[in-house]
Amino acid sequence: MTINFDNATLILEAEGLRCPEPVMMVRKTIRQMADGDTLLIKADDPSTTRDIPSFCRFMDHELIAEDTETLPFRFLIRKGLSA
């Protein structure tokens, strides 16, 4: 199955930002989203490959897809119902 990163409800451009800024921006953006909405994050900080999946697990959001093979890294998250 091919994931279409282009159908996200919102896009967060976090390129050029370094830890912890990308995850802080994700957290702030997700708080403003409706349950079930999707967020595409574009980032180039290597720590996001670890931090964003961990954030999703900890906060009960669904990491639908991630592309960490090329820059910018892309992460597609669905906001969890309990967040």
Curated annotation (Swiss-Prot):
State one molecular function term (GO).
Answer: sulfur carrier activity
Sorted keywords for this record are:
Cytoplasm
Q: What GO terms in the biological process aspect are recorded for it?
A: tRNA wobble position uridine thiolation
Query: Where in the chain are disulfide-linked cysteines found?
Result: none
What are the catalytic residues? C19 (cysteine persulfide intermediate)
One Pfam family assigned to this protein is TusA
Q: Which residues form the signal peptide?
A: none
CDD domains tied to this protein = SirA
Subcellular localization(s) per the UniProt record: Cytoplasm
Q: Which GO terms describe its cellular component?
A: cytoplasm
Q: What is its main location?
A: cytoplasm
Q: Which family does it belong to?
A: Belongs to the sulfur carrier protein TusA family.
Known role = Sulfur carrier protein which probably makes part of a sulfur-relay system.
Q: What is this protein called?
A: Sulfur carrier protein TusA
Organism this protein belongs to: Aliivibrio salmonicida (strain LFI1238)
Provide the taxonomic classification. Bacteria, Pseudomonadati, Pseudomonadota, Gammaproteobacteria, Vibrionales
